[in-house]
Amino acid sequence: MSDLLAGAYLAKGTIGNVGTPGAPIATFSLVVVPSQHSVTGTVIITQAVQGPDSHIVVPVTGKIYAAGLGKFTQLVSLKGQYVHSVPPPAIGSFLAEFNAHFAIDNAWNGVGGFSYYQHNVENVPVAAAKNLQTELA
């Protein structure tokens, strides 16, 4: 049973153009189990522009696989759902989809993209959290 979690570790970072005014940023905190090719955690999407999509919390699951793509050594895919509330004058909420994909190196830096209700962000940087970079070095 303990072999199921062999090599498990925590990965934290961002997807998006951090520092660009108004750009949506997806911050991830994931438990990665390479032996099972599984990823589970939380993504928080933030945007400086106020509105219904300015702070979204999404529980996610996904897959991680080894890659042979030059400097990128791993491919990650994430998916999840969150409750999206419709702004007035409409009334109601529904489950919206979140998807992300990225190609990263062993330090969790690379390139990727993500999509959520009526938003699609592609070809943006993926960056490991600063404290994670020293732990993985």
Language-model features: locations:
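Short, cysteine-centered beta-strand-loop-beta hairpins and adjacent loop/turn segments enriched
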Residues: 18-22, 47-54, 85-89
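Amphipathic hydrophobic-ligand
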Residues: 22-26, 53-61, 92-96
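Mid-chain, well-packed structural core segment of small domains
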Residues: 61-101
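Edge beta-strand at a domain terminus
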Residues: 53-65, 109-137
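Short, solvent-exposed loop/hinge segments that bridge or flank secondary-structure elements
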Residues: 2-36, 54
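N-terminal glycine/threonine-rich, aromatic-flanked beta-hairpin/loop signature
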Residues: 32-57
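Short, solvent-exposed aromatic-acidic interface loops
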Residues: 43-49, 79-85, 115-121
